[in-house]
Amino acid sequence: MKFFLDTANLAQIREANALGVLDGVTTNPSLMAKEGIKGAEGCKQHYLEICEIVNGDVSAEVLATDFEGMVKEGKELASLHPNIVVKIPCIAEGIKAIRYLYGKGIRTNCTLVFSPGQALLAAKAGATYVSPFVGRLDDISSDGIDLVRKIVEMYSIYGFDTQVLA
């Protein structure tokens, strides 16, 4: 099991990193906005600051929702730092982008996963990580942990290397 922090707050990241147990950080546009980070250049600079703190993977999410846009942003983000993992939504265009980026050696984190079927698509496309929305499922009276259990079991049975972040 790995410990990832879901935040863009540098103080929280420093504090968790000081414990010596932090394996990585995941971010998203909402978390960046909450920290007052604006624009693509502001986000890129912030990702670099996070990478300087953490000796582990840092998920940086694309803003585009079309294949071409996700691929373009994904390449740009991946070129910032070796620890950047491109976070892409689990939509049809996102699965195509994950597959394309995988072919280019770019690591990805497939987010907005609500079902084992979506997790299967992400793994088949070559995602490094998959991020099921456990909290959201729990909020709507679904069992988020059960989803994680099903995904982990499926990946184990079929030999997928994709890791589950929950």
Regions found by a protein language model. Name each.
Residues 107-109, 120-166:
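Catalytic alpha/beta core domains of metabolic enzymes, predominantly
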Residues 38-45, 69, 114, 139-147:
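Alpha-helix N-cap and loop-to-helix initiation/capping positions
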Residues 82, 86-130:
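Hydrophobic, well-structured mid-protein blocks that either form specific transmembrane helices
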Residues 1-3, 21, 83-85, 106-108, ...:
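Short active-site oxyanion
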Residues 29-31, 113-116, 134-139:
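Short, acidic/turn-prone active-site loops that include or flank metal/cofactor-
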Residues 4-5, 9-13, 19-22, 27-100, ...:
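Active-site beta->alpha loop and helix N-cap motifs at the rims of alpha/beta catalytic domains
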Residues 51-52, 102, 123, 156:
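Anion (oxyanion) recognition and catalysis
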